[in-house]
Regions:
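Bacterial N-terminal signal peptides
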Residues: 2-14
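Intrinsically disordered, low-complexity segments enriched in proline/serine/threonine
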Residues: 10, 19, 28, 174-177
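Intrinsically disordered and other compositionally biased segments
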Residues: 11, 74, 169-171
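Auxiliary, metal-adjacent structural segments of Zn-dependent hydrolase domains
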Residues: 16-88, 94-99, 144, 149-157
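Short amphipathic alpha-helices and their capping/turn segments at secondary-structure boundaries
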Residues: 93-94, 107
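Post-HEXXH active-site segment of zinc metalloproteases
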Residues: 99, 115-147
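Active-site recognition of the HExxH zinc-binding catalytic motif
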Residues: 103-116
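Long, well-structured alpha-helical subdomains associated
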Residues: 144-180
């Protein structure tokens, strides 16, 4: 006979449904070498996890994330969106190898979600919510803010971890010599 004993926390976790981006990427995101970084980011940032899950729920969308040596126009990342007559979307995200991917991934995923939401980038220019870069690509305030938000979430966790590590690894206080 085999008996199984679960801790209460583990039992609760087993009862909760596993959602996309918890332990694996949604089927419509192909990330190859970037998969571990994307999953780690989704596990530690609520905002990025929501982006990832939203992309995963968009059936007409396919996303490819790849590393590259250089990005056109001196950028660190870019997303090229392809729209198909039947309504499908394909997003090709390129990240410069060795860059800090935290802010870049969230920023580029937000560009994808802008297109899912039907944002017309040319219309956004007049309101200041979008602009053209030197290379002619569009940039948006929404994507910029998404990247900054995820960066803040990760930095806050890192700061907490650093404080805990300092306390855990701090040298014990020296005992004071007794006075006679």
């Amino acid at each position: 006979m085999v008996s199984l004993v679960l801790t209460p926390l583990l039992a609760v976790r087993l009862m909760l449904p596993v959602t996309a981006c918890d332990t694996s990427l949604p089927a419509n995101i192909a990330a190859a070498a970037m998969q571990p970084q994307i999953l780690a980011l989704a596990q530690h940032s609520v905002s990025f996890r929501q982006q990832c899950q939203r992309i995963g729920r968009t059936r007409v969308l396919r996303v490819t994330v790849q590393l590259t040596g250089t990005i056109e126009g001196r950028g660190r990342a870019q997303t090229v969106i392809h729209r198909y007559d039947a309504g499908g979307l394909r997003a090709e995200v390129s990240l410069q190898f060795g860059a800090d991917y935290v802010e870049l991934l969230a920023h580029e995923f937000e560009h994808i979600l802008e297109q899912v939401d039907g944002v017309v980038l040319r219309d956004e220019i007049g309101s200041g919510r979008a602009w053209r870069t030197e290379s002619g690509a569009f940039e948006t305030r929404r994507a910029f803010n998404a990247g900054v938000q995820v960066r803040r979430e990760i930095d806050a966790l890192t700061a907490e971890d650093d404080d805990a590590k300092r306390r855990a690894f701090a040298a014990p206080a020296q005992p004071r010599p007794r006075q006679p």
